[in-house]
Curated annotation (Swiss-Prot):
The variability of the residues taking part of IgE-binding epitopes might be responsible of the difference in cross-reactivity among olive pollen cultivars, and between distantly related pollen species, leading to a variable range of allergy reactions among atopic patients. Pfam families: Profilin. Binds to actin and affects the structure of the cytoskeleton. At high concentrations, profilin prevents the polymerization of actin, whereas it enhances it at low concentrations. Phosphorylated by MAP kinases. Belongs to the profilin family. A motif (Involved in PIP2 interaction) lies at residues 81-97. One of its GO terms (biological process) is nuclear migration. The modification Phosphothreonine is found at T111. CDD domains: PROF. It is found in: Cytoplasm, Cytoskeleton. Keywords: Actin-binding, Allergen, Cytoplasm, Cytoskeleton, Disulfide bond, Phosphoprotein. Occurs in many kinds of cells as a complex with monomeric actin in a 1:1 ratio. This is Profilin-8. It comes from Zea mays.
Length: 131
């Protein structure tokens, strides 16, 4: 299965009638492997800061998580495994695997829990595959 198929079929799938706003799978080096059409343009620096927060949990807390022009307030996640952010009625979930970051962005009516489930389910699968 191609990386784009993982994004299209496993991240942008319908959950209780709702979809993520956008999603991507990005390498630890910040290069996008696959992304939905609406995924924001981001800087390599954005991904470097996210990777640093996985290595040093709390790194993003003072400044927030930036993805392109959008700033998310970092909320409770799982140190070294999952970063969650909130902005207004939406937010972001980032799951780290051995080689990639699985990123999902949502807005109402999708809930944070639904976004977490979609992103973490694919991330856990990729981890089990050694990816």
């Amino acid at each position: 299965m191609s990386w784009q198929a993982y994004v299209d079929e496993h991240l942008m799938c319908e959950i209780e009638g709702h979809h993520l706003t956008s999603a991507a799978i990005v390498g630890h080096d910040g290069a996008a492997w696959a992304q939905s059409t609406a995924f924001p343009e981001f800087k390599t620096e954005d991904m470097a800061n996210i990777m640093k927060d996985f290595d040093e949990p709390g790194h993003l807390a003072p400044t927030g998580l930036f993805l392109g022009p959008t700033k998310y307030m970092v909320i409770q996640g799982e140190p070294g495994a999952v970063i969650r952010g909130k902005k207004g009625s939406g937010g972001i979930t980032v799951k780290k695997t051995g080689q990639a970051l699985v990123v999902g962005i949502y807005d109402e009516p999708m809930t944070p829990g639904q976004c977490n489930m979609v992103v973490e389910r694919l991330g856990d699968y990729l981890l089990k595959q050694g990816l």
